[in-house]
Amino acid sequence: MLPLYPDISPEIIAIAIGSGAIGCTIVTDSLFWLVKQYCGATLNETFKYYTTATFIASVVALAGTFLLSFII
């Protein structure tokens, strides 16, 4: 994909990939279970709050990456 868009910085692509990856947190993720045990929450509570939080973090990071792409 990078050769098709030579104006896009490879660093921005890497940040965008990382930003999108944190939004896909599911119950098979080991950090999900670590957060569940550390917080003492039920499975439903952890799924609701942790998944929502990581999704919001991913969207904010992608928006920041988009803004950063204008600077770099």
From Swiss-Prot:
One cellular component term from this protein's GO annotations in UniProt: plasma membrane
Protein's UniProt name: Putative D-serine transporter DsdX-like protein
Species of provenance: Escherichia coli O157:H7
A molecular function (GO) term: gluconate transmembrane transporter activity
Disulphide-bonded residues: none
